[in-house]
Regions:
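Short Lys/Arg-rich amphipathic alpha-helical segments
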Residues: 14-33, 41-50, 57
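Interfacial segments of multi-pass membrane proteins
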Residues: 24-37, 85-88, 168
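Membrane-helix exit/interface motif
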Residues: 36, 53-65, 86-101, 105
Length: 178
């Protein structure tokens, strides 16, 4: 069961670039969360639960192994990618932001038969931002990446998600996708 969680439904076993596959594996869940109009608070609660499960799964999966962050463990990418989408959920969960930013910057109508190009651009931008920060690892992400524990495996991707979320906030606020 822990391998199933650590590899995010075995997506982490895909080659090449299992981390990228893990990040992609997070996106259908974000899409579902948008369809069911999940509140940002619930997104953060679910992300926290998956973080704790991922931490435990990583602890068990790396026990008695020489490598502290095997490439097939991608649960950290999933949580980091979900954190990247936090600004979008803040906007869609908050009526004040929803009317001012959603109407003027992008048109999200996830329940319609035709999806706006803007939601595709938001997904693409979020994915690229997270992958960028996860690969480049500027400080303090690089510092967290050096923590050779299961917490460190998870934490560097949390920071990459936070950096990506900040960039996505700027992009959405200034309408840079329009």
């Amino acid at each position: 069961m822990m391998r199933f969680i650590a590899t995010w439904f075995y997506i982490g076993l895909l080659k090449p670039a299992p981390g990228t596959w893990g990040s992609l594996g997070a996106l259908p869940f974000i899409y579902i969360f948008l369809i069911i109009e999940l509140n940002v608070l619930y997104l953060l609660i679910i992300s926290s639960i998956v973080f704790i499960l991922g931490w435990l799964a990583t602890l068990i999966e790396t026990k008695e192994k020489s490598e502290h962050d095997p490439s097939e463990i991608v649960i950290d990418e999933v949580v980091g990618q979900w954190i990247t989408f936090t600004p979008l959920f803040i906007i869609t969960s908050n009526e004040k932001f929803h009317t001012s930013i959603c109407r003027n910057v992008f048109n999200i109508n996830i329940n319609s038969e035709t999806y706006s190009m803007d939601i595709i651009l938001i997904f693409l931008s979020s994915f690229i931002l997270f992958c960028f920060f996860d690969i480049i690892k500027p400080w303090p992400i690089s510092w967290a990446d050096q923590i050779s524990t299961p917490f460190g495996v998870m934490f560097d991707d949390i920071l990459a998600g936070i950096f990506s979320a900040l960039c996505l906030t700027i992009i959405l606020f200034f309408g840079l996708l329009s």
